[in-house]
Amino acid sequence: MKFLEKLKQAGNRNKSLLCVGLDPDPKLMPVGMSALEFNREIIEATAPFVCGYKINLAFYEALGKQGWEILSETCEFIPRELITIADAKRGDIGNTSKAYARAILDELDCDGVTVSPYLGYDSLEPFIEYQDKGIFILCLTSNQGSTDFQMLKTEYLGQKRFLYEVVADKASLWNRYENIGLVVGATQQEELKKLRLSYPKLPFLIPGIGAQGGDLKATIENGTNPNGELAIICASRGILYARSGSEFAQGAAEAAEQMRDAINHYRKRF
């Protein structure tokens, strides 16, 4: 099944654009609980309210030699009707890029992955050639330092354009399999609106809601397409750690349901 088709089906099933980030932090998890058990309970509690899950590979790499096993088993826990996106931000050349793609899209069998465009098309091609997978290119990120490079102006097709605009245009040109999307932060509302108007058919993976300060109402208004779709709204800490102790899973379920419902409230205009 093509990524966009699966995304639409998952969104319709749960009436949701919400994507929960599975970022297990031992300092915030219940004392004595393993990352695998934490993830399992979070998935079971939140699955009715989401379109999918975003797994930040760094949190698993930080767990040492057992991290990959936890990551793999976490992917297996996620219901197959929901999407799984590996937040890996990979970007390298030649066989290295091919190996990254195999690890994430074959071995883990994730539905999508985040990639960095800094090394150019040949670094992304091994991912893009997985025609049924969603390839999300970092375009305009939610962190403060994004302006260091992404907002620089450069000459492109005879015009002065911001670098993030060049990335978006290149992504659109590379989208021959209709499997490419953009990562655009919810902290960049003016630019988010501009990108959506320019690329109404690309899915946007949108981090930055909650702890990073992104406004949910503005994100839905600016980040969805004319049908109120093609935006994957990411939330992690505000859901995973909504409550502490033994009630963490119930707290996550309630937080996910509330965010799903808030998103749908703002989608009503569509």
Swiss-Prot record:
Active site: which residues? K89 (proton donor)
Stated EC number for the protein is 4.1.1.23
Q: Indicate the family of this protein.
A: Belongs to the OMP decarboxylase family. Type 2 subfamily.
Give me the reactions it catalyses.
Answer: orotidine 5'-phosphate + H(+) = UMP + CO2
Task: Please name the top-level EC class of this enzyme.
Answer: lyase
- What Gene Ontology terms for biological process does this UniProt record contain? 'de novo' pyrimidine nucleobase biosynthetic process; 'de novo' UMP biosynthetic process
InterPro entries xref list = Aldolase_TIM (IPR013785), OMPdecase_type-2 (IPR011995), OMPdeCOase_dom (IPR001754), RibuloseP-bd_barrel (IPR011060)
Organism, by scientific name, is Dehalococcoides mccartyi (strain CBDB1)
Q: What SMART domains does the annotation carry?
A: OMPdecase (SM00934)
Cite the GO molecular-function annotations of the record: orotidine-5'-phosphate decarboxylase activity
Can you say what this protein is called?
Answer: Orotidine 5'-phosphate decarboxylase
